Amino acid sequence: MAARVIDGKAVAAALRAEVAARAATLPYAPGLAVVLVGEDPASQVYVRNKERAAKAAGFASETIRLPASASQAELLALIARLNHDPAVDGILVQLPLPAGIDPQAVIRAIDPAKDVDGFHPDNVAALALGTPFLVPCTPRGVMKLLAAAGIAPRGARALVLGRSNIVGRPMAALLLAADATVTIAHSRTRDLAAECRRAEILIAAVGRAEMVRGDWVSPGATVIDVGINRTAAGGLVGDVAYAEAAAVAGAITPVPGGVGPMTIACLLENTLIAAAARR
């Protein structure tokens, strides 16, 4: 039997509509400032998508573009200005940054109360301690997809493939908080396929095209594919070999149309949360 497809576009559309409705009840428009340094084509696409989504939700959205030649000091000065701007509730600096700018220094410079990416050490610590405030958008989106699909992590064996600070580590923390039994696997894990086969919930976030094959998936497991990889032909594939995995899994997210739309929807929700907490 083919796996049930978890439609991230539909879940994201519902969340965006909910955020817009909640924002409309406020006496102010939540303010989101997006900073783009340089002219990376993929980053420009992401920023345009975020800007459109924010405006559609009724937010006051501002995109600030700096040249690739901008110094770290210039970027930090801009962040300091945004930190003190009462009309700005959320600040997002689009990654990756040009060479010569330390991304960790930039992340640390953002006011944690406006850190809608959830990357500031204060927000990372709050998540690890079980008292989350602003949570990284992609892991937050994955948890919402699981909930929408009626898949409860409590008591389940969950494996997160990937240990990045952006997805893997916060994903594991959220699953642990939801009472899953969590394993983090990575490039140094022995017998990776066997570890994946033990999982009832398998979340792939490693950035390698179609790395997870069908025989890595336990029959009936839920497979969440966070990866977005461009093929030589210009198409998009995830970290999971979709057709193979879909023949075995109980439920699966597609690429595109799975986790991706949830990331932007959760960015809007984080901005709304930040605005409500500040004003």
Swiss-Prot record:
Pathway: One-carbon metabolism; tetrahydrofolate interconversion. PROSITE patterns: THF_DHG_CYH_1, THF_DHG_CYH_2. PANTHER family: C-1-TETRAHYDROFOLATE SYNTHASE, CYTOPLASMIC, C-1-TETRAHYDROFOLATE SYNTHASE, CYTOPLASMIC-RELATED. GO terms for biological process: L-histidine biosynthetic process; methionine biosynthetic process; purine nucleotide biosynthetic process; tetrahydrofolate interconversion. One of its GO terms (cellular component) is cytosol. NADP(+) binds at residues 162-164, 187, 228. The keyword Cell membrane does not apply. It catalyses: (6R)-5,10-methylene-5,6,7,8-tetrahydrofolate + NADP(+) = (6R)-5,10-methenyltetrahydrofolate + NADPH; (6R)-5,10-methenyltetrahydrofolate + H2O = (6R)-10-formyltetrahydrofolate + H(+). Its EC number is 1.5.1.5, 3.5.4.9. Catalyzes the oxidation of 5,10-methylenetetrahydrofolate to 5,10-methenyltetrahydrofolate and then the hydrolysis of 5,10-methenyltetrahydrofolate to 10-formyltetrahydrofolate. This is Bifunctional protein FolD. NCBIfam families: PRK10792.1, PRK14188.1. GO terms for molecular function: methenyltetrahydrofolate cyclohydrolase activity; methylenetetrahydrofolate dehydrogenase (NADP+) activity. Belongs to the tetrahydrofolate dehydrogenase/cyclohydrolase family. It comes from Acidiphilium cryptum (strain JF-5). Homodimer. InterPro entries: Aminoacid_DH-like_N_sf (IPR046346), NAD(P)-bd_dom_sf (IPR036291), THF_DH/CycHdrlase (IPR000672), THF_DH/CycHdrlase_cat_dom (IPR020630), THF_DH/CycHdrlase_CS (IPR020867), THF_DH/CycHdrlase_NAD-bd_dom (IPR020631). Keywords: Amino-acid biosynthesis, Histidine biosynthesis, Hydrolase, Methionine biosynthesis, Multifunctional enzyme, NADP, One-carbon metabolism, Oxidoreductase, Purine biosynthesis.
